[in-house]
Structures are given as structure tokens and as C-alpha cells.
Amino acid sequence: MILSPSLLSADFSRLADELAALEAAGISWLHLDIMDGAFVPNITFGQPVIQSLRQRSSQLFFDVHLMIEEPARYLEAFRDAGADMLVIHAEADRHPQRTLSEIRRLGMKAGLAFNPGTDIAPLRWLAPDLDMVLIMSVNPGFSGQKFIPQSFDKIRATRTMLNAAGAGDWRERAKLARVLTAGADVLVSGSAFFGHPPYDRCHQRFQAAARTAADNAHDARCAAAALWQPGRALKK
């Protein structure tokens, strides 16, 4: 299981120290939520912050979640800033196949996200052009929302289509075990990680939960579930 802490829950007054602490704790992925205030209500950060983070860390895998309209306009800019993977939203792109293909042509991993009310049927046609699927288990834009229980069925359905799975940013106890049981291999966690230092011990708790799938393993917060495409190399 790979743990990908969400930067939004980090201390923005000391990001360089946060990155160093993540690497010291054995973290290999960093989840970066990009919001534009249009596709979702909030505004977060953009390429300059990612570029600054990349200058501080050449080892972390930057998992960049684009919650923005017309993401195809910014692919090269995010690549140049240091993104390793770009995840676009099915609802925000009129031509997702073209955009996913372009992301991969630019040398990055390509992911596709689906909001809670969006059907995953297009995966039948888009799967060859992507590396990962992100199933949102809350409506995007705000942290701390209640996990939508129907998401479990959606995760299982997507796993059936892709035969690989991962997970996002959690809220309630016992959710972690159920998502792991469904086949999760990437957990994205915000305040459940950054709010429970020291990071090395928190990382160990998540790893223990992955091994045992115990209902009380960790009080994680889940906002999404990412499913990896079979046959594609998973960066660890």
C-alpha cells in the first residue's frame, strides 16, 4: 500500500520542513489538490508552488489532482513545474481521451477522476489511455465532508473494470478497512496524516492497517479512491 499525504493539510508556513519530514518518514508520494474557484468553490495553489516544492524534493512522486476547468490548457505548465502524474476530472474536460493521451505523451502518468454522481461507464472507452482512476467519495472542494457510503459499490465496480485499486482522503472509523478490502493500493490522507505527528509513526499505522485491514486500525478521513490500471508500472 502507498500512502499519499494531501498537501492541503500541511503547515504552509513551513512547507520545506514538511517535505523533509515526509521523506524522513519514508513517504514516497505527495498528493497536490489544485482548485480554481470555478470547477470547485475553493482556490488553492498552482504551478509556482509545485515548482518550489520540486526544487526541495527530487524524490517524492507528485500526484497532482486538477480540480479545474479546461485542464488541457495547463498540461505542459504542470509538467514543467514538476508533476509526475496529472489527474483530470471527467466532468471538466470535453475531450478526456485526447487530454489523457496528451498527458502521457508529455511523459507523465494520466489519471481520470469521477465525482460521486458521475457514471463510470466512459471507462470502457478511456481505460487504454489512463494509468489511474480517482473515485470521489465526497463532493470535491471542501475538506471534512461525510463519506458517501454508495462509494463502496462504485469502487468495486471500477475495480472490476480495471483490476486495480487505491484510496483517497477519509473521515470515519471503519472506512479504511472496507476500502482496503475492496482492493485499495494508494491511500490519500489529509488531516488524518498531517494532524497526527510524528509522521513516521502515522505512516506505520497506515501500513499496519493495510496489512491487517482492521476496522479500528486508524481514524482516517476518506474523500476519494484511486484505482490503478493493470499492466501499468506503479511508482513506489
Regions found by a protein language model. Name each.
Residues 19, 72-80, 118-128, 171-187:
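Catalytic cores of alpha/beta
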Residues 113-151, 157:
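Histidine/lysine/aspartate-rich catalytic loop segments that bind and position anionic ligands
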Residues 15, 22, 33, 78, ...:
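Conserved, mostly hydrophobic/aromatic
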Residues 195-222, 226-231:
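C-terminal helical cap(s) of enzyme catalytic domains, especially alpha/beta-barrels
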Residues 88-94, 134-144, 182-203:
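Glycine-rich phosphate-binding active-site loops on the catalytic face of alpha/beta enzymes
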Residues 43-64, 102-111, 151-167, 206-215:
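Alpha-helix-loop-beta-strand connector modules within alpha/beta enzyme cores
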Residues 2-6, 30-32, 53, 62-66, ...:
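Hydrophobic faces of well-ordered beta-strands that scaffold small-molecule active sites
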Residues 31-47, 138-146:
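Glycine-rich, proline-tolerant flexible connector loops at the mouths of alpha/beta enzymes
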